[in-house]
């Protein structure tokens, strides 16, 4: 019980300047009786608040998961029922299929022949045999006509002479397209043959030209070798020089062409064949500076300058 003479003075926050909380923002006064419960949780630490919030969220998630699990269980029950019905239908249709296959196999197998029915005339109680049907009469007439026609055709075939071979139709024999194609084929074959012959001729010409060039080059190289050997004064009677100069025998085709060249070579070298008969250099002068041996060419007036130039080099 409030014994203050002015109790309302202290119950209002407007008349308590030291009790005013400037950080408090709420529609309910700070010292109101309804606000006492709001300030009561200030003593609870923040960790407990966080834990309680997490626990409440986990409980909610657990409830949701349980609801989903129940829904999945219901779906599984429905699917099991559907699978059972489908299994029953499958068994039913497999049995029906086996039955139909057995019937089809039995239909394919020929049935045993039934015993022939006895004619009605054999029975005494029947006065006479039943008349044949109208269709049977027509079938018999058709068979008779067919036999007559086959006989007539056979007799006509025997009496007629063999037919001559059919001539080719003028449309086919005189067809311009076929003649044009045959002419084109002939022209193509002839042109291909001519081209092949031309290639062979060109190849042979190339071979002959290469052979002649080789022969001429061989002769020119032999001539140059002989000239160089005479300029250096090397004895031509040595086996190396004879092997280089006369390594191959001239072919009969090139003998006639090489005759004038050999004659010119002999005239130019002034009877170079005489140099082959001269003896080699003396053993005493073997270690001395080599000098060209004197030949008939040195006495000739137009080779005097060449001989002096060679001696100057040595």
Curated annotation (Swiss-Prot):
Q: Which family does it belong to?
A: Belongs to the SPC42 family.
Coiled-coil features, chain-numbered ranges: 52-109, 184-215
Q: Does the keyword Nucleus apply?
A: yes
This protein's GO cellular component annotations are: cytoplasm; nucleus; spindle pole body
Query: Would you tell me the protein name for this molecule?
Result: Spindle pole body component SPC42
Quote the InterPro entries the UniProt record gives: Spc42 (IPR021611)
- Quote the gene name from the UniProt entry: SPC42
Arranged from A to Z, the UniProt key words for this protein are: Coiled coil, Cytoplasm, Cytoskeleton, Nucleus
């Amino acid at each position: 019980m409030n014994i203050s003479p002015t109790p309302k003075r202290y119950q209002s926050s407007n008349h308590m300047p030291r009790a005013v909380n400037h950080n408090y923002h709420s529609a309910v006064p700070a010292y109101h009786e309804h606000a006492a419960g709001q300030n009561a949780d200030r003593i609870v630490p923040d960790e407990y608040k966080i834990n309680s919030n997490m626990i409440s969220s986990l409980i909610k998630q657990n409830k949701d998961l349980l609801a989903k699990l129940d829904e999945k269980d219901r779906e599984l029950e429905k699917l099991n029922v559907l699978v059972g019905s489908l299994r029953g239908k499958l068994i039913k249709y497999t049995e029906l299929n086996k039955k139909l296959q057995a019937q089809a196999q039995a239909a394919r197998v020929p049935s045993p022949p039934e015993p022939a029915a006895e004619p009605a005339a054999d029975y005494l109680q029947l006065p006479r045999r039943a008349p044949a049907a109208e269709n049977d009469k027509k079938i018999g007439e058709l068979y008779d006509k067919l036999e007559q026609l086959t006989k007539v055709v056979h007799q006509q075939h025997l009496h007629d002479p063999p037919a001559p071979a059919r001539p080719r139709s003028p449309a086919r024999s005189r067809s311009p397209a076929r003649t044009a194609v045959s002419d084109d084929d002939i022209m193509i074959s002839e042109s291909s043959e001519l081209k092949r012959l031309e290639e062979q001729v060109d190849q042979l010409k190339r071979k002959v030209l290469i052979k002649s060039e080789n022969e001429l080059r061989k002769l020119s190289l032999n001539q140059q070798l002989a000239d160089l050997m005479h300029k250096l004064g090397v004895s031509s009677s040595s086996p190396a020089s004879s092997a280089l100069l006369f390594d191959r025998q001239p072919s009969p085709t090139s003998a006639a062409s090489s005759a004038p060249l050999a004659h010119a070579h002999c005239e130019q070298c002034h009877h170079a064949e005489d140099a082959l008969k001269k003896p080699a250099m003396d053993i005493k002068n073997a270690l001395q500076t080599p000098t060209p041996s004197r030949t008939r060419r040195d006495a000739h007036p137009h080779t005097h300058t060449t001989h002096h130039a060679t001696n100057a080099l040595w």
